[in-house]
Swiss-Prot record:
This is Flap endonuclease 1. Its cofactor is Mg(2+). Residues 336-344 are annotated as: Interaction with PCNA. GO terms for biological process: base-excision repair; DNA replication, removal of RNA primer. It comes from Drosophila pseudoobscura pseudoobscura (Fruit fly). Phosphorylated. Phosphorylation upon DNA damage induces relocalization to the nuclear plasma. Mg(2+) 2 binds at D179, D181, D233. Residues 354-386 are annotated as: Disordered. GO terms for molecular function: 5'-3' exonuclease activity; 5'-flap endonuclease activity; DNA binding; magnesium ion binding; manganese ion binding; RNA-DNA hybrid ribonuclease activity.
Length: 386
C-alpha cells in the first residue's frame, strides 16, 4: 500500500522536491531496486497485453523476461542496479496482509462471475488483481540476476527499508520503487517509474527527502508521524483525517501524542488500541542488514548459463538471449565515463543536518516577515514553535 496520498501532498505543498528526468540522467548511478515491485509489474504487464509467457508446463516466465530485458535497458543507460528482495513481513503488517487476503477472495468471486458471464474485460481486470509474486518467482529472478552478473540483496524484512539503508550508507544513490514509504524509512532519494517499460514513455520521477521536509515544514520524526496519519501498512489511521487535515495537525502540534490530546473526538474516530508508537519505531529503527557490510559487485555475465536457464523449457529465443548477453558484456566494459559529481564526496544526510537546514530557512523566513511588518506597520504572524 505504501503511504496513502503522500505523492499528491508533496506535489501540492513541496513541488520543489520532485524532478522529472529521462533515464539517461542517472548515468553512472547505483540504484537499489525493490525487486518484488518489479516482478509484480512484469507479471501484470504481460497479462495486460493479452498473453501470458509460460514454460511448456504452463509456469509463467513473464517475470524473467521483464527482469532480463529491463535490467539490460538500465545497464545500457549506464545505471548499475542492485535488486533487493523482501524477507519476512513485520508482525505489524499482519492486519494489512489480512485485508489483502480478503480482497483477493473477493476478486476470485468476481472473476468467477465474470467468467460465467463471458465478460472478457472484467475477466482481465480481476485476473490482474489476483497476480502475486511467489517465492518461486523470487528464486528464479535471483538465479537469473546471478547469471547476468547483477548483484542482489536478501532483506531480513521489508525491501524498501533495506533499500533506504543502502542509500543512507552511501552504497547507492537512490531507491527505485513505487511505494512511497521508502521515504518514510529515510531514503534520501526515491525514483518512481524507473523500471517502467520504454513504451509507456513515463519520465522518471525523483523525490528529494531533504527538499520535501523543507517544503512540508517538518523534520524527519514529524514526517514519520505524518505518514502514519495518512495511512501506512503497519497500523490503522484515524478515520476522517485526510492529507490536508493531517499536515495541518502535524504543523500545529508536531507529534501524534499532542494531536490526540487536542483532537475533537466527536469528529474523528481514533482506532482502539492504536499501535502508532510501534509503527513509528518500525520506521525509525527497521530490521535491516548492516548496509556498510554489504559488498556490491557487478560481474561478467555467464552467456552459456543464461542460454541454458532461459531457453529449452522456458522457451526463450536463443538468438535473443545471446544478443542480450552481448549487451550485458558491452555495458560492463563501456562504462568508462564518470559523473563529474563523483569526484566530490557527498556525506549521507543526517537528522541533525536536516534540522539545521530547516532552522536556517525558518530564521530567514522570520527575518523577512519582521522586515515586512516594520514597513507595513502590521504585525507578522508567527508559527507555533517546534
Amino acid at each position: 500500500m505504501g503511504i496513502l496520498g503522500l505523492s499528491k501532498l508533496i506535489a501540492d505543498l513541496a513541488p520543489q522536491a520532485i524532478r522529472e528526468s529521462e533515464m539517461k540522467h542517472f548515468f553512472g548511478r547505483k540504484v537499489a531496486i525493490d525487486a518484488s515491485m518489479c516482478l509484480y509489474q512484469f507479471l501484470i504487464a504481460v497479462r495486460s497485453e493479452g498473453a501470458q509467457l509460460a514454460t511448456v508446463n504452463g509456469d509463467p516466465t513473464s517475470h524473467l523476461m521483464g527482469m532480463f530485458y529491463r535490467t539490460i535497458r538500465l545497464l545500457d543507460n549506464g545505471i548499475k542496479p542492485v535488486y533487493v528482495f523482501d524477507g519476512k513481513p513485520p508482525d505489524l503488517k499482519s492486519g494489512e496482509l489480512a485485508k489483502r487476503a480478503e480482497r483477493r477472495e473477493e476478486a476470485e468471486k468476481a472473476l468467477k462471475a465474470a467468467t460465467d458471464a463471458g465478460d472478457d474485460a472484467e475477466i482481465e481486470k480481476f485476473n490482474r488483481r489476483l497476480v502475486r509474486v511467489t517465492k518461486e518467482h523470487a528464486r528464479e529472478a535471483k538465479e537469473l540476476l546471478s547469471l547476468m552478473g547483477v548483484p542482489y540483496v536478501d532483506a531480513p524484512c521489508e525491501a524498501e527499508a533495506q533499500c533506504a539503508a543502502l542509500v543512507k550508507a552511501g552504497k547507492v544513490y537512490a531507491t527505485a520503487t513505487e511505494d512511497m514509504d521508502a521515504l518514510t524509512f529515510g531514503s534520501t532519494k526515491l525514483l518512481r517509474y524507473l523500471t517502467y517499460s520504454e513504451a509507456r514513455k513515463m519520465p522518471v520521477k525523483e523525490f528529494s527527502y531533504d527538499k520535501l521536509l523543507e517544503g512540508l515544514e517538518v523534520n524527519n520524526r514529524e514526517f514519520i508521524d505524518l505518514c502514519i496519519l495518512l495511512g501506512c501498512d503497519y497500523c490503522e489511521s484515524i478515520k476522517g483525517i485526510g492529507p490536508k487535515r493531517a499536515i495541518e495537525l502535524i504543523n500545529n502540534y508536531r507529534d501524534i501524542e499532542t494531536i490526540l490530546d487536542n483532537l475533537d473526538t466527536s469528529k474523528y474516530t481514533v482506532p482502539e488500541n492504536w499501535n502508532y508508537k510501534v509503527a513509528r519505531e518500525l520506521f525509525i529503527e527497521p530490521e535491516v542488514a548492516d548496509a556498510s557490510a554489504i559488498d556490491l559487485k557487478w560481474t561478467e555475465p555467464d552467456e552459456e548459463g543464461l542460454v541454458k536457464f532461459l531457453c529449452g523449457d522456458r522457451q526463450f529465443s536463443e538468438e535473443r538471449v545471446r544478443n542480450g548477453a552481448k549487451k550485458l558484456f558491452k555495458s560492463k566494459h563501456a562504462q568508462t565515463q564518470v559523473r563529474l559529481d563523483s569526484f566530490f564526496k557527498t556525506l549521507p544526510s543526517t537528522p541533525n543536518a536536516v534540522n539545521a537546514a530547516k532552522r536556517k530557512a525558518e530564521e530567514a523566513k522570520k527575518s523577512a516577515n519582521n522586515k515586512k511588518a516594520k514597513t507595513s506597520g502590521g504585525a507578522a504572524r508567527g508559527r507555533r514553535p517546534k
